[in-house]
Amino acid sequence: MSQQLSFNASSAKPDKSFSNYFWGANDEGYHALLSRFSDVKHINEELRSFYHERANIEEDYAKRMAKLSRTTFSSLETGCLKESVQVMKAEVDNMAKSHLQISQLLQDDVENAFTRYAASLKDKKKMIVSGIEKVHKDKLSKHQALVKAQDKYHYLCKKVNYYVSQQNMLFGKELEKNNAKLNKTQNAITASSSDYQSAVAAVRDSYARWTNEWRSTCDKLQDIEEERRHFLKSVMWTFTLLISRSCFNDDQACERIRKNLEQCSVSQDVLEFIDAKSTGTGIPQPPKFYDYYKGEVPDDSVELVQANFQRAQTKIENDNMPLNRPYVLSATARNESSFENTLPNTPSAIQSLTTVSSNSSQNGRSSPKKSFLSKFKLTSRPSTPNVGNTAPDALSSPRNDSPLTSAADEQMKHLSLQEEPKQNPTPAAPGAFPNSNTLPPRYNELGSLPSPNSVSFTEDSRPNVNTPSRRQQIQEEFGSVLQMENRAVSPVYDSRKNGSRSSFTLRKSRSPKRPSSSLSQNASRLPRSLTPGNLEPNYDFGVRVDPASGTAPTDDEPYTDRDSSFVDDTINTKATGNTSNRLSLPAYPTDGGDTSIDNPTSTDGQRILGYVSALYDYDAAIPEEISFRKGDTIAVLKLYEDGWWEGFVVGEDDHNRGQFPSNFVREIEV
């Protein structure tokens, strides 16, 4: 039987509720909402199983940690480190107890909550479903009786019409029989019509009752659904609070360990170890030659000489230097989601360490790498293709507005030789941070805190290039520094190879620029696992003056470091742009001597800037880096402004070169 739905066109769209949107000609809404109870039961059971397994994991973790805290280790340790080890064991035991308590709370407040809710839901279902099912069955039975009465009445009506149509076609006895049947059917149709009307009235009453009951049931079912969703939100919220409490308890335990370590003095421990375990200060001398032929007889005494050595000054700047080293994140940890983006407070241990590092820098301590860095120009990260040696006419001719030319003009303005003092940043110790309020680089890497404050400049911190002593120092120390890399021939210079060659070039690093974003999916462009401390400043060493030129550079504009590129060669004089007044850099040292000994190169001819020794082990996190072990000697080929250097391990294939953190090494003299 076809169903035709009629709506009042003037009525507005009903509100979104169960009582308005769960109807249907064949009771589709009734079946949809009642089947929801089965879905909810399945959902609750899945979540209960999940939290049950999570509580078991927490309990197993707590038991294993408690077992670990009862193990015996470092019994031979001495000094305050022995006390720190005991504190660590006690705090690990506290962590185990905390996690065991959390596992119990997960079982009581989370897992068992689903069991209690399932029992409550079962009672509600029994009460609601049983009532509406009776009404629904009564409606169905009345509707079936209506259909049966309707079919019977329809059949009798068809028979009456048939007998009436036969009256004009029959005669005699056949006509009499037809009329008798017609009278009998007419009597039956009267009773059938009465039954049919009664069935319609009964169905009308059952539909009215069904509409009221189902509307009320829809409201109750919607209340149950809303209550269920609030329950799930509450349970998941409780779960997160318990896990957060566990992490907070662990952090408090770690903070107590850190505070104990802050009180530990390595120097004092060493002195106490010497007092407790020293074996004497006498150095036994080698045995003498006894001439038995002359009657010399050795005695049993051992000749001792008092030891009075002076220990070489250590490179460690303070007793807490190992704590200043930033934690090296693994490649997996670097790519995980950064929940530390909104760190509320800096841990006290990190704050104290940054304060120590800043104080050491402010007290005049320069970086142990300063003597090494001050000899070379740091290479900034590239953002444009390499620009080779440009002919003088190209420099003096009008330029277009290309990005490369604009960058060169901008840098030439910053390096123009005018009579103004140039500012030089104060050098900072490796691993130190600009101020005590700045987190270590691993936190900056996550993007959670503002960038470090700019370092202060002093007006008289940079010596004037004009002074004769300064020019002589430049000529002696940095005569060939700017030719330290073998560059590919620039397209600009190649097209002008027959013209005069300018001594000043725009120098770019050929290494790809590392993106700061941690969302890159290219493994070779992942963010650094470690930013090696504060960026070393560009120590001012000026430019080399051509002895044939009588023009000396002046400092009129302050030097501004550029991240993308910088101009260390192409400089115009302040005067008129006359090419004859330009400074020129000799391609080779003025002494004319052989530089092959003083300037070692790699097998491919690239200049080796110096050598460093590894202080720690380091494993490469991305293909652009190299791995080395503590004590390895590394030849340095390039220096970058972000604190990463490029080189290779001496003794290995020098083609296997890559970048490494500069605060993992120290300078050595070769």
From Swiss-Prot:
Any single Gene Ontology cellular-component annotation: actomyosin contractile ring
Domain (F-BAR): residue spans on this chain: 16-269
GO molecular function: cytoskeletal protein-membrane anchor activity; phosphatidylinositol-3,4,5-trisphosphate binding; phosphatidylinositol-4-phosphate binding; phosphatidylserine binding; phospholipid binding
Biased composition (Polar residues): 380-389, 450-472, 570-583
Comp. bias (Low complexity): 357-377
InterPro entries, per database record: AH/BAR_dom_sf, F_BAR, FCH_dom, SH3-like_dom_sf, SH3_domain
Region of interest called Disordered, as start-end residue ranges on this chain: 353-472, 489-602
Function: Required for normal septation. Involved in the disassembly of the medial ring during septation.
Name of this protein: Septation protein imp2
Protein source organism: Schizosaccharomyces pombe (strain 972 / ATCC 24843)
Lineage start: Eukaryota, Fungi, Dikarya, Ascomycota, Taphrinomycotina
Gene, per the UniProt record: imp2
